[in-house]
């Protein structure tokens, strides 16, 4: 079973379309949050996620948008009510059972972190291995990661919609996970 993984789209529909093309045929697709920007909604991105059957969780940007501070942006007349409602009811985390493996989807960390950025070289990264899942898929840092913490495989697809300059590259990325083989790959691209 192949799972296509995107995260941190931040309203970038062309990047999502490119990622879908590059991931190729997959059995399922997941979005690990931040499909929108804190105070900006994207009908196009949310429609693509919904209409292409992405299993989607919320990130910190959705939490801001659907929180008290997002009341005014949510009232914009151009936002499609059905898309707004679809995104609003998506969970903040989710565990999938695929091919006998537990796959945990989170945006930031499996533990309550207040949106903390935990990168692969951080001391806290080892805490990912404390979960009972076989695989943790997470986003938030905008940095692609394939690593292990204990027996747990950790995959971060990086940012599919908004690259950050940490290593001098402005590449967007997504990932594909072969669940049976526990074999992930990162796909880097530019528009």
Can you name each region flagged by the protein language model?
Residues 93-95, 105, 174-176, 186:
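Conserved hydrophobic/aromatic beta-strand scaffold that supports enzyme active sites
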Residues 10-15, 37-40, 62-67, 111-113, ...:
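Active-site environment of divalent metal-dependent phosphoester hydrolases
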Residues 70-76, 99-132, 162-165:
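Active-site-proximal segments of metal-dependent phosphoesterases and phosphodiesterases across multiple
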Residues 2-92, 96-97:
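Core catalytic region of metal-dependent phosphoesterases/phosphodiesterases
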Residues 2-10, 102-109, 153-158:
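Active-site-proximal beta-strand elements of phosphoester/diester hydrolases
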